[in-house]
Amino acid sequence: MTNMQLVPLLILVFVGPYFVKGKTLDRPLNEQVESNDLKRQITNIQNTVWTSKDISLLKRSIMKKNEEKLVVATAAKSESKMGSNYDYNDDDYDDYDDYEDYSNLVYEDDKEDEDFDYPY
């Protein structure tokens, strides 16, 4: 064997086991540890036995979050409707335009009361 044939054989002998196991030389050791921790966490979650109480608590918390979102969305929608129908910043708006002036009106009942002298 010549040296040119021996070099690829030596590379294959020393580097081959890393590729067979799925590990490469450029992959750092801490990534392998992190992936093993993640695999362990996933199997722990998969092996967890969920009781009916756990499931009902989870459902209740999800429903509560959805209700809060619904209330906020409804409030925002009603506020946007009110803002579109009524302009509070209108300069021409006068508080007293909507009310008629009743101060000068005299009712028939009031006239009768003026003529009557109360005993007290």
UniProtKB/Swiss-Prot annotation:
Its main location: secreted. Residues 1-22 form the signal peptide. It is found in: Secreted. Expressed by the venom gland. It comes from the Eukaryota. GO terms for cellular component: extracellular region. One of its GO terms (molecular function) is toxin activity. Keywords: Secreted, Signal, Toxin. The keyword Secreted applies. Belongs to the scoloptoxin-25 family. This is U-scoloptoxin(25)-Er1a.
